[in-house]
From Swiss-Prot:
It is found in: Cytoplasm. Mg(2+) 2 binds at residues 266, 269, 305, 307. Its EC number is 5.3.1.5. It comes from Halalkalibacterium halodurans (strain ATCC BAA-125 / DSM 18197 / FERM 7344 / JCM 9153 / C-125). This is Xylose isomerase. The keyword ATP-binding does not apply. HAMAP family: Xylose_isom_A.
Length: 440
């Protein structure tokens, strides 16, 4: 069965192409900084938005027209697998990601859910035998069903905690069976609405215990995946415990989990936390905890997670700058956790959206690499902090001074002189590099 009959395999045609089903900048074989674009840009398709999302919102029903939606139940799940691998092949993407309930419906009991999952996982595994597309990561959905109303690993109900543990155990087994390179934890319901009825310490300790059990079980079954935490400050919960990268680092280090986890950073979640995307990437990178990326963008005029496809070239450039500085994402990738707009309801809009996102990150890669080759920002930063390369500054940087010595030095100073930060000049230079992308 085929679902995208009027779309051929998407090819690179160059910046002057007017073909809406062609890449203008993403050339998977093009060499950038010693690697192909495909090696740098480990693109992934989000199963939930692409094959499950129906376009509904709090004010209206679904609008998406999907040829596989003529089916229901397990027949629908199987049709989505067929549609997914056709889409992967035509877009030539190396990875995909899913939550357990994306690929198979929940049953009346946990055992029924396992049975459904086993059947669909077997089907996915069979398709993967003849496909180049691999599983970047999988995860357990522990936020949609009413059982998660008060959380999963942070629920005040121990029965729910046990159910969540069972879901993750099954998820780890599925990840191993399908060769997932990572496993993600996103705590959409792990947080609180009010402190008036919350034992925060118990909830955080229980969450840490949960993660330790997951680490132990992955080792027990030989599942060598990178564990990832995906920060988000709010939505659906008022205050989520994985608020941002800084909060996540504090939690992981406090509970002795930092050796086992890195971060899966989503652009729109950074926006909701009051940060830029590059801020979260940078902070994770300098702590050696940048693991993977959910590639999307938010709307700064709106206060919720809009999950738009990434087309902001400034953002993709600065994101790829951080990723290149990180020497890539290792086992991670660029997962399009993004959905077409509610008014973009035709199935072929899925191709337009992903092509736009892939081209945007290809541009970001080329511009970021040129910035690095020309040491545009490195020279600016080195010059700005040059006072720490000699004299008293070098002693500070080398932990070779104390308050007494610094006081004596300060007393000997005359008027302190500053250098301009030159933000406007730097931004103008970035504009130049973006506008010259076709030269690189």
């Amino acid at each position: 069965m085929t679902f995208f009959n009027d779309v051929e395999k998407v090819q690179y045609e160059g910046p002057r192409s007017t073909n809406p089903y062609a890449f203008k900048y993403y050339n998977p074989e093009e060499i950038v900084a010693g690697k192909t674009m495909a090696e740098h840009l480990r693109f992934s398709i989000a199963y939930w938005h692409t094959f499950v999302g129906d376009g509904s919102d709090p004010f209206g029903v679904g609008t998406m027209q999907r040829p596989w939606d003529q089916y229901s139940g397990m027949d629908l799940a199987k049709a989505r697998v067929e549609a997914a691998f056709e889409f992967f092949e035509k877009l030539n993407v190396p990875y995909f990601c899913f939550h357990d309930v994306d690929v198979a419906p929940e049953g009346e009991t946990l055992a029924d859910t396992y049975k459904n999952l086993d059947e669909i996982v077997l089907m996915i595994k069979d398709y993967m035998k003849t496909s180049k597309t691999k599983l970047l990561w999988n995860t357990a959905n522990m936020f949609t069903h009413p059982r998660w109303i008060h959380g999963a690993a942070t629920s005040p109900n121990a029965d729910v905690y046990a159910y969540a543990a069972a879901k993750v155990k099954k998820g780890l087994e599925i990840g191993k069976e399908l060769g997932a390179e990572n496993y993600v934890f996103w705590g959409g319901r792990e947080g609180y609405e009010t402190l008036l009825n919350t034992n925060m310490k118990l909830e955080l300790d229980n969450l840490a215990r949960f993660f330790h059990m997951a680490v132990d079980y992955a080792k027990e079954i030989g599942f060598d995946a990178q564990f990832l935490i995906e920060p988000k400050p709010k939505e659906p919960t008022k205050h989520q415990y994985d608020f941002d990268v800084a909060t996540g680092i504090a939690f992981l280090k406090t509970h002795g989990l930092d050796e086992h986890f890195k971060f899966n950073i989503e652009a729109n979640h950074a926006t909701l936390a009051g940060h830029t995307f590059e801020h979260e990437l940078h902070l994770a990178r300098i702590h050696d905890m940048l693991g993977s990326v959910d590639a999307n963008q938010g709307d700064t005029l709106l206060g919720w997670d809009t999950d738009e496809f990434p087309t902001d070239l400034y953002t993709t450039t600065l994101a790829m700058y951080e990723i290149l500085k990180n020497d890539g994402l290792g086992k991670g990738g660029l997962n399009f956790d993004a959905k077409v707009r509610r008014g973009s309801f035709e199935a072929n809009d899925l191709f337009h959206a992903h092509i736009a996102g892939m081209d945007s990150f290809a541009i970001g890669l080329k511009v970021a690499n040129q910035l690095l080759e020309d040491r545009v920002l490195e020279d600016v930063i080195d010059n700005r902090y040059k006072s720490y390369q000699s004299g008293i500054g070098q002693k500070i940087a080398n932990n070779d001074t104390n308050l007494k010595e610094l006081e004596a030095y300060a007393l000997s100073l005359g008027e302190i002189k500053h250098s301009s930060g030159q933000q406007e000049r730097i931004k103008a230079t970035l504009n130049q590099y973006l506008l010259r992308v076709n030269e690189y």
